[in-house]
From Swiss-Prot:
Family designation: Belongs to the ST7 family.
Name of the protein described by the UniProt record: Suppressor of tumorigenicity 7 protein
Keywords, alphabetical: Glycoprotein, Membrane, Phosphoprotein, Transmembrane, Transmembrane helix
One GO location term (cellular component): membrane
Residues carrying sugar: N47
Record organism: Papio anubis (Olive baboon)
Record keyword Nucleotide-binding present: no
Residues recorded as bearing Phosphoserine in the entry: S386
Gene: ST7
Subcellular location: Membrane
Residues passing through the membrane, by range: 15-35, 62-82, 512-532
Length: 585
């Protein structure tokens, strides 16, 4: 019964929609019939005569004023359209036409849309959740004191935005603090330090936290039950204070490494103590989770220091050990650091093994994963690749695999090739990136450009094939090929993450809609005609009459430019030019 009632309601709705479609025609004929019947009481004939007489009495100045007014209105519409397009990326009139006028004029298949919505509701919700712009911590981020601040000292430019640094402060509060920090004076100070905006205030707070730990405290624990001998202990060092000093105060990588080694001693001790007490309650469990994050962060940054200082093999070993010890902590994306270090060692077999583990359909992708896979496949054929030879004989299987890998990488992040091919200048990468955005492209190319240059012919193959990706995805914002449609929000988020002196790469490149171009041309042409008519009324009148004769005459093909100009001279009575006189010596 319920299904029958539902079917009857759907049929009734379709009948109502069908009747409304043709009811407009009925109303139109009814209005025409009423006008015809009431033509005498309404004095329609007299009104038409009055209107025609009024139009006949209008002077050319009225038409000039009317043309100027229409040009002004068109210009205002053009300015509004341009502003709306710059702000929202679409034409206002086109959007209104598509959203409101098309359903009224062309109709919409409600049944099919309802069915598609009901059947694809889950997939649409999943797509929206996946395509939502999420900002990620840059796994290859630089050191503020040793790298970012030195860039500022040399160039006078700030490489980090306030939004980016604010995200880092939130990350530090999440990773390095817990609810029980107020019980320990040093941790309480550091909890406030991570929220400080002023770098000098943060550094001073870190030094204060370390000074507190230097104070000896008497712990009244007798070594022997019936003895009066007491044990003197030192408060445990504050590992997070060393982290802050290594990140922001150290001016060289070597100084940062020394501070991180001190942080490792303190962090390892705190981690072992909290590991023994983690099952005693939720408070101890949260403290152990915090100590785990601190220890992983310290070891990862020590590996990055070794990589910066040229000890690449040592860095690889530290990263492998860290991934084995903490396999579940994927939020730091240590495998991307490992891939970059292995590429520096040219250990391509090890790189392939890491990709086989992390380039999985169930795991989130990144530019490092996609472009490293493309680099490995391009390495097998790039040294012998020639576009002329490929056009003659076609692509081999290995070349086809390399091209498909490049297309896959470009579809995921289309901004990277311009940086790898040095078509666009690089800047220092931000501390946070947006997947598939310009910020991720900068972070990848900053560290991996040297690896692409090291593989002979890889950049040439990329240069010849990367633009072919866009033929497979003509509408990247609506439908993708191997990935979800390109998210619309990347440009806005990248502008917040990247400094103002950098020109953000936009994909797909926005082109002005035809309506804006047409309105601009029509407005300019009309304004020019109005100005010429106002300044040269006689000449424009002759020109208009000549043009009307050309288009209205049956013999317009026999006319030529000479006859037109002769007629203009006769009408305006232009005097002949004076003959030049030759001066004799």
């Amino acid at each position: 019964m319920a299904e029958a009632a539902t079917g009857f309601l759907e049929q009734l709705k379709s009948c109502i929609v069908w009747s409304w479609t043709y009811l407009w025609t009925v109303w139109f004929f009814i209005v025409l019939f009423l006008v015809y019947v009431l033509r005498v009481p309404l004095k329609i004939n007299d009104n038409l005569s009055t209107v025609s007489m009024f139009l006949n009495t209008l002077t050319p100045k009225f038409y000039v004023a009317l043309t100027g007014t229409s040009s002004l209105i068109s210009g205002l519409i053009l300015i509004f359209e341009w502003w709306y397009f710059r702000k929202y990326g679409t034409s206002f009139i086109e959007q209104v036409s598509v959203s409101h006028l098309r359903p009224l004029l062309g109709g919409v298949d409600n049944n099919s849309s309802n069915n598609s919505n009901s059947s694809n509701g889950d997939s649409d919700s999943n797509r929206q959740s996946v395509s939502e712009c999420k900002v990620w911590r840059n796994p290859l981020n630089l050191f503020r004191g040793a790298e970012y601040n030195r860039y500022t000292w040399v160039t006078g430019r700030e490489p980090l935005t306030y939004y980016d640094m604010n995200l880092s402060a939130q990350d530090h509060q999440t990773f390095f603090t817990c609810d029980s920090d107020h019980l320990r004076p040093a941790d309480a100070i550091m909890q406030k330090a991570w929220r400080e905006r002023n770098p000098q205030a943060r550094i001073s707070a870190a030094h204060e936290a370390l000074e507190i730990n230097e104070i000896r405290s008497r712990v009244e624990v007798p070594l022997i039950a019936s003895s009066t001998i007491w044990e003197i202990k030192l408060l445990p060092k504050c590992a997070t204070a060393y982290i802050l000093l290594a990140e922001e105060e150290a001016t060289t990588i070597a100084e940062a490494e020394k501070l991180f080694k001190q942080a490792l001693k303190a962090g390892d001790g705190c981690y072992r103590r909290s590991q023994q007490l983690q099952h005693h309650g939720s408070q101890y469990e949260a403290q152990h989770r915090r100590d785990t994050n601190v220890l992983v962060y310290i070891k990862r940054r020590l590996a990055m220091c070794a990589r910066r200082l040229g000890r690449t093999r040592e860095a690889v070993k530290m990263m492998r050990d860290l991934m084995k010890e903490f396999p579940l902590l994927s939020m730091f994306n240590i495998h991307e650091n490992l891939l970059e270090a292995l590429l520096e060692l040219q250990a391509y077999a090890d790189v392939q093994a890491v990709l086989a583990k992390y380039d999985d359909i169930s795991l989130p992708k990144s530019a490092t994963i996609c472009y490293t896979a493309a680099l490995l496949k391009a390495r097998a054929v790039s040294d012998k690749f020639s576009p002329e030879a490929a056009s003659r004989r076609g692509l081999s299987t290995a070349e086809m695999n390399a091209v498909e890998a490049i297309h896959r990488a470009v579809e995921f992040n289309p901004h990277v090739p311009k940086y790898l091919l040095e078509m666009k200048s690089l800047i220092l990468p931000p501390e946070h990136i947006l997947k598939r955005g310009d910020s991720e492209a900068i972070a990848y190319a900053f560290f991996h450009l040297a690896h692409w240059k090291r593989v002979e012919g890889a950049l040439n193959l990329l240069h010849c094939t990367w633009e072919g990706t866009f033929r497979m995805i003509p509408y990247p914002l609506e439908k993708g090929h191997l990935f979800y449609p390109y998210p619309i929000c990347t440009e806005t988020a990248d502008r917040e993450l990247l400094p103002s002196f950098h020109e953000v790469s936009v994909y797909p490149k926005k082109e002005l809609p035809f309506f804006i171009l047409f309105t601009a041309g029509l407005c300019s042409f009309t304004a020019m005609l109005a100005l010429l008519t106002h300044q040269f009324p006689e000449l424009m009148g002759v020109f208009a009459k000549a043009m009307s004769d050309i288009f209205c005459s049956a013999e317009f093909r026999d006319w030529n430019c000479k006859s037109i100009f002769m007629r203009v001279e006769d009408e305006l009575e232009i005097p002949p030019a004076p003959q030049s006189q030759h001066f004799q010596n």
